[in-house]
Amino acid sequence: MIIGVVSDTHLREGRVKLPAKLMEAFREVDHILHLGDWMTLEVYDQLSKLAPVDGIAGNNDGYEIIERFGEKKILSFEGVRIGLVHGHEPYSSRITTPQKARKAFEGEPVSCILFGHSHQPYLQMDDGVLMFNPGSPTDKRREKLYSFGLLEIRGGQVLPRHVFYEDKG
């Protein structure tokens, strides 16, 4: 099973055009997970034409997105429990976004935590839990490249990778 992972699209209503590189890659996935800051459900509409979509809301999402997706969840794919959280809470500059994401699932059995918020691609193991941030496909901030993620789940293993590109067109 291949899961497309995206976060921080930050697209405004009526101006939704997801990058061609992302759309092309997500045509081949079995499921898509969005980790917040959709900004409009038009992003959901575009992605859901490619594969089933789930996700969570981020700190820039409105009531409609929060109501539809919630702000934290655990999903299971082929027996692998995956935690989804945006990564902005608790509001504190004393801990990093990965630390906030990890803290959100403290005491909960998950194999992998997917998070966004920082727009920074991230891939690390933390005490046996895979921590993965896909970066942003549309708003790279200080990063050199735009990015999204792909997770392959095979035999109970999660095999993550980032997809990087220069042009968001």
Segments the model singles out, each with a brief description of its role:
Residues 2-10, 81-88, 129-135, 160-162:
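Active-site-proximal beta-strand elements of phosphoester/diester hydrolases
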Residues 54, 93-162:
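Conserved beta-sheet core of the metallophosphoesterase superfamily
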Residues 11, 40, 89, 120, ...:
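Short active-site segment of divalent metal-dependent hydrolases/proteases
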Residues 20-24, 43-46, 72-73, 101-104, ...:
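Short, flexible, glycine/charge-rich loop motifs used to bind or transfer phosphoryl groups or to couple energy/partner
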Residues 87-91, 164-169:
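A short, sequence-level motif marking secondary-structure junctions
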Residues 5-7, 31-37, 54-59, 84-86, ...:
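Active-site neighborhood of phospho(di)ester-bond hydrolases with catalytic His/Asp-centered motifs
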Residues 1-53, 62-71, 79, 144-147, ...:
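N-terminal active-site segment of His-dependent metallophosphoesterases
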